[in-house]
Every structure is written in structure tokens, then in C-alpha cells.
Amino acid sequence: MKRLIKDFTFDELKKWVEETGEKPFRANQIFEWLYKKNATDVNSFTNIPTQLRKRIEEEFILNSLRVVKYESDGESIKFLLELVDGNAIESVFLPYKYGNAICISTQVGCRMKCAFCASTIGGMIRNLSAGEMVDQIVNIENITKKKISNVVLMGSGEPFDNIENVFKFIDIINSKEGKNIGARHITISTVGIVDGIYKLSEYPKQVNLAISLHAPNNNLRNKLVPMNRKYSIEDILKAVDYYISKTNRRVTFEYALIDGVNDSIECANELAKILSGKLVHVNLIPVNPVNGRNFKKPPKERVKEFYNVLILSGIQVTIRRELGSSIAAACGQLRSRHYNISEK
């Protein structure tokens, strides 16, 4: 069975090259074709000996994805990507003034069961490999003809539910031989898997941490984010404090504002109270409507009122620029709509 070549770190590929009897520098050349030139056809590896190219073709898959469809709202572009086994994932290309970002998936489906998220529709199918995550970047760079400088692991799936592959993915794209994307330009978003936060605290690369909080108290969060029954807000905040003490990195708390659910002034005051004095940033996200879920975004005036409460409490906060509601840009919507995936 062929292996995906992008599942290999540089050191792993160098070892494979040496085992074939070739010189180690061939690994540098192969990585240059894969990551600097985004080549997906071994026949384009013109400086690689024919015999080694043949060996690569026999043993490896160079591209694990194909684009099924994409939609654009004039700025962001949402991609539906099919894997070799027929499963599908989504990625979003996001152009900003500071550079181009990509929001990638880490799993096919998700088992976190967040109430407002389309990724959970149909349940969890499988983890993505490191190479399947890398291929989201390579394919979208090839299509858009734009270099990606920022990576957010905030698509379908829970990154800390696939932590070993996620760390390997980061090692590959951060390496100078690979994509050479700076660690501080990579963000992991989690619903609050406490074990993962502690592991990230010890991880040698200074990637960013974002917590999908969405509620200021356990009673409400238990309903919106069922994983809260295992990892409470208190557990998450304790882990975040440890992460900050180890890394001195500011943590982002994502808060999806849902009309009539978690957008009251009382909720804003509660949120300000639990985050006060911490090295954090709050990202307010007016929720995208999801088919089959009765959630809608609050009026702009209420979003601004919520924002003002946090600002007056001394908390750093932004309202996320709304991208992609017309293209079903929230996690999992394009996949569930295209394949008519329903709740399990």
C-alpha cells in the first residue's frame, strides 16, 4: 500500500533516501519540489535521478486531495476537498492585509457535538494524517496562486483529539526545508481539551492557542459544548494559566454570539469576571446559521453592547470580520450540504 509522502518529516524522508542508497541531499531536493514548488507530479522532479523518481512513484502518493468544489464571496474562498478514501473535508482561504491565512481541518467530522457547529453533523469518521493537513495548504496555494503565511487549525475536527498528527503537521510546515511558516503564525483552536493544553505548554514550538469557550458559566456551556461536562471552565482556565506561565503567550478565547442564548449583558459581565486579569484576547464571532439548528446571530447593536462590556472591563477584544456567510463558511456546512449529511 502506498504511503503519503507528506506524512514524512524531513528527517524521516532523509532516512528513507539513504536506505535507497541515495545521498542525503536528495531529501532536500525532494522537499524543495514538494514544499517550495508545490509539485504534485514526480515527473516534474527534474533534478532527481530517474531511478529514484520511479521508486518515489512506486512507494508514495504525492497528493492526497482533490478539489470537489469551491465557493467565494469575493474575499474568502471555501474549498470542499475529497480524500483518497472518498471522505471529504473543508478548508477556507482568508486574505488579510497582513497576509493570507488558511483555516484547515484536522479530522473528517468531529465528535465534540458542539450545538451550533455543522462539523458534528454525521459524527466523527477519522483523524487526518499530518500529510493530509499539509496537502490542504499545498492544494490551495496552487489554486489561488497565493502564498499562505498564517495557518489556523479551526476547521472540522478537534485538533487535540488528533494531537500527535497535529504536532507532526506543525513540525513539517514550520521546518525550513518544508513550508517554513513561523510557529507564531500557527494557531491551534480547541474546545478545551485540558490534556492537550498541558501538552502544548511543553511543546517546544511557540504556536498560538485559542479556546472555543462560547459561554461564561458551566450550566450554559454544558448545553453548547458537551465536552464541558468532562473539562469544566474552571479546569480550562487552570490549564490556560499554566500555559501562559510556561509560554508567556496571550491566549485567544473564541465566543460565538448566539441570539437570545449567550449574548446578554449578564453573560458579558460573567465573561469579563472569569477572564479579568489574565493574558487573554476575546474574539467575538456572530454565529453563522446552520441548517437544522435554530441559532441565529444577534443584532449588531447587541454585539456592540457585549463588546463594550468587555472593553470597559479592561479585556482585549475584537469582533471577527464576517467572512463567508453567503458561502456556508462555518465549519462543516459545505460538506454536509454537498453530501446531504444528517445527524446521527
Swiss-Prot record:
Q: Which species does this protein come from?
A: Caldicellulosiruptor saccharolyticus (strain ATCC 43494 / DSM 8903 / Tp8T 6331)
User: What are the UniProt keywords, alphabetically?
Assistant: 4Fe-4S, Cytoplasm, Disulfide bond, Iron, Iron-sulfur, Metal-binding, Methyltransferase, rRNA processing, S-adenosyl-L-methionine, Transferase, tRNA processing
Q: Where is the Radical SAM core domain?
A: 96-326
| Protein name, UniProt field | Probable dual-specificity RNA methyltransferase RlmN
Remarks, anything else? Reaction proceeds by a ping-pong mechanism involving intermediate methylation of a conserved cysteine residue.
SUPFAM superfamilies, A to Z: Radical SAM enzymes
- GO annotation, cellular component aspect: cytoplasm
Q: Which reaction does it catalyse?
A: adenosine(2503) in 23S rRNA + 2 reduced [2Fe-2S]-[ferredoxin] + 2 S-adenosyl-L-methionine = 2-methyladenosine(2503) in 23S rRNA + 5'-deoxyadenosine + L-methionine + 2 oxidized [2Fe-2S]-[ferredoxin] + S-adenosyl-L-homocysteine; adenosine(37) in tRNA + 2 reduced [2Fe-2S]-[ferredoxin] + 2 S-adenosyl-L-methionine = 2-methyladenosine(37) in tRNA + 5'-deoxyadenosine + L-methionine + 2 oxidized [2Fe-2S]-[ferredoxin] + S-adenosyl-L-homocysteine
